[in-house]
Amino acid sequence: MSMDFSPLLTVLEGDFNKDNTSSATEIDTLENLDDTRQISKGKPPRHLTSSATRLQLAANADVDVCNLVMKSLDDKSEFLPVYRSGSCAEQGAKQFMEDEHICIDDLVNHLGAAIQCSSLGAFYGVFDGHGGTDAAHFVRKNILRFIVEDSSFPLCVKKAIKSAFLKADYEFADDSSLDISSGTTALTAFIFGRRLIIANAGDCRAVLGRRGRAIELSKDHKPNCTAEKVRIEKLGGVVYDGYLNGQLSVARAIGDWHMKGPKGSACPLSPEPELQETDLSEDDEFLIMGCDGLWDVMSSQCAVTIARKELMIHNDPERCSRELVREALKRNTCDNLTVIVVCFSPDPPQRIEIRMQSRVRRSISAEGLNLLKGVLDGYP
């Protein structure tokens, strides 16, 4: 049976997650980030990427409706994101550069005849390597191919992404030309029309800028995080001084096969990503993806405040990514730095007005409070 998926329809797996919502409690939570940032090991130089395009989801595929959940996006909304990305990577204080990243604003042109969907969207990734460059380079080169070649793609994108992370881990181990003791975290963003799917394994982070608010779309997989520590100890691992088995500062990674058992066996160091999906709206202005070299020295809200201020001035995501890197270096980050900024509109963010309720008693909106917190976080 042939079906047409317009921008107002999307194909999902059954485990749909609702969009993030913000509250005063959430704002406080985002500001009280985990201060225990472990420094990864050592880091061959990088490049900048910047391009722009407008895309819209319209895919034809033979589907078994029993295996799909079709969710209508907001029928009243005519919003379609315009993908404009920029990136910046710097070696920083490290001896070597081990980060890799990828920015693809137009998947159709990039993949060509390799896929039968007439129009997909965009794909971005940040890969923070450690113990050498082999793992990060391998994942950057292959992860998108593993996703689109998976039998679940494009009908069950989340399943395909999870499978691709595991396949990348196994295929890396099988490549005799590579140092399989090297490893990498992996953070990817896959966009179909207005549907954004974030996958993360490690301590890179994706943050959505929503009218000045920072909405975290990924969790930092640190060994001393409660959920990760429980999982690690259940599988026979230990967390010592914030390090997995006293060796690694992340709880999830691709590679590092010197710390893993036979293929298919449960292991404290997991390559499995956590996924978060959301439907983009007019309020969603940009996405920041960065390695821990950025987040070690600034909060998510601070990064959003800086990015928004820069975009209001020049509306250039590449310059914006460079400014975030510059600010992190200014704050003496000890790690490699990689930042991607993806804008969802051709226009710059609009100024947010803070309205006072009265002369006697004044209040500030949640959006204004977020902006103020970002400024107080140390950005002039």
Swiss-Prot record:
InterPro entries: PP2C (IPR015655), PP2C_BS (IPR000222), PPM-type-like_dom_sf (IPR036457), PPM-type_phosphatase-like_dom (IPR001932). Binds 2 magnesium or manganese ions per subunit. Induction: Induced in shoots by drought in roots by abscisic acid (ABA), and both in roots and shoot by salt stress. GO terms for molecular function: metal ion binding; protein serine/threonine phosphatase activity. It holds the Pfam family PP2C. It is found in: Nucleus; Cytoplasm. GO terms for biological process: response to abscisic acid; response to salt stress; response to water deprivation. Keywords: Cytoplasm, Hydrolase, Magnesium, Manganese, Metal-binding, Nucleus, Protein phosphatase. Expressed in roots, leaves, stems, flower, and trichomes. Its cofactor is Mg(2+); Mn(2+). Disruption phenotype: Decreased salt tolerance. One of its GO terms (cellular component) is cytoplasm. Mn(2+) 2 binds at D128, D292, D335. Mn(2+) 1 binds at D128, G129. It comes from the Eukaryota. Gene3D superfamilies: PPM-type phosphatase domain. PANTHER family: PROTEIN PHOSPHATASE 2C, PROTEIN PHOSPHATASE 2C 27-RELATED. This is Probable protein phosphatase 2C 27. The gene is PP2C27.
